[in-house]
Amino acid sequence: MSQFEKTPGWLDWYANPSKPQFKLPAGAVDAHCHVFGPGNEFPFAPERKYTPCDASKAQLYALRDHLGFARNVVVQATCHGADNRAMVDACKSSGGKARGVATVKRSISDAELQQLHDAGVRGVRFNFVKRLVDFTPKDELMEIAGRIAKLGWHVVIYFEAVDLPELWDFFTALPTTVVVDHMGRPDVTKGVDSEEFALFLKFMREHQNVWSKVSCPERLSVTGPKALNGEQNAYRDVVPFARRVVEEFPDRVLWGTDWPHPNLKDHMPDDGLLVDFIPHIAPTAELQQKLLVDNPMRLYWPEEV
């Protein structure tokens, strides 16, 4: 038994995902996933806003193999704060098949950054979703960005669409490649031609260093249908958004499962059916190759490209 009690109502990851009908291209990368603990080995951070179920590296890599991915990018989960040990352990245990994205504080030493790099970390995540993290001053984040730029790392940013105007100047001043999580969480009820989503497309159009993950339809969808019970046309309301980004910026998009799907309230998707969502947003083999192989390899394994 874990020493940690899960947040009431917590949804555990889907235990027996289906085998995807969509065959992933060889070398496909799950470019956004997490590990949680296990809490008895890697305790959750005291300042966390939620307490998850355990989701171990072994379970993550079993899912990788089941779905047909070759590699993973393991993103530091907010429940671990700036204690990157669980993520680093997952990367080190992957036989070179995983890279990491860390959360760091201003106090981190150059030697500690180098240790993260040697473990496979290639980016840091700045989270602006207020319900998930406490505020960090922007000057501190900019200082961190300047330091990690020297290692060739990038910055991953997580924010809500409504906050893009106030964050614009900060984001556009970052000295690295910038990767947006989940298309900046658009409100899909406003439609793909909304002013809100137009601003996000402008952000990408005007800044060639900005990439986007076209992931997490299960978080963004309002009308579904859900990726459950064999549903092959899940999350129709999200498709136009992701497809627009993939087709306009084919060389700057990534995709990931977001396993084990932290903080979902409505339902827990079947990860096999999430993979079957991909051809709806990247309809050609060429777009699928860029989204799933070429782009993540260029960003995370450039030495192999």
From Swiss-Prot:
Catalytic reactions on record: 2-oxo-2H-pyran-4,6-dicarboxylate + H2O = (1E)-4-oxobut-1-ene-1,2,4-tricarboxylate + H(+)
Domain of life according to the entry: Bacteria
Name of this protein: 2-pyrone-4,6-dicarbaxylate hydrolase
Induction of the gene: Induced by 4-hydroxybenzoate.
Short name of one Pfam family: Amidohydro_2
Activity control mechanisms: Strongly inhibited by 1 mM Zn(2+), Cu(2+), Mn(2+) and Co(2+) ions. Also inhibited by 5,5'-dithiobis(2-nitrobenzoic acid) (Ellman reagent) in vitro.
Name of the gene encoding the protein in the UniProt record: pmdD
Function of the molecule: Involved in the degradation of aromatic compounds via the protocatechuate 4,5-cleavage pathway. Catalyzes the hydrolysis of 2-pyrone-4,6-dicarboxylate (PDC) to oxalomesaconate (OMA). Also catalyzes the reverse reaction.
Family recorded in the similarity comment: Belongs to the metallo-dependent hydrolases superfamily. PDC hydrolase family.
Disruption phenotype: Disruption of this gene results in a strain unable to grow on protocatechuate and a variety of aromatic substrates funnelled through this compound (m- and p-hydroxybenzoate, p-sulfobenzoate, phthalate, isophthalate, terephthalate, vanillate, isovanillate and veratrate). Growth on benzoate and o-aminobenzoate (anthranilate) is not affected in the mutant strain, indicating that these substrates are metabolized via a different lower pathway.
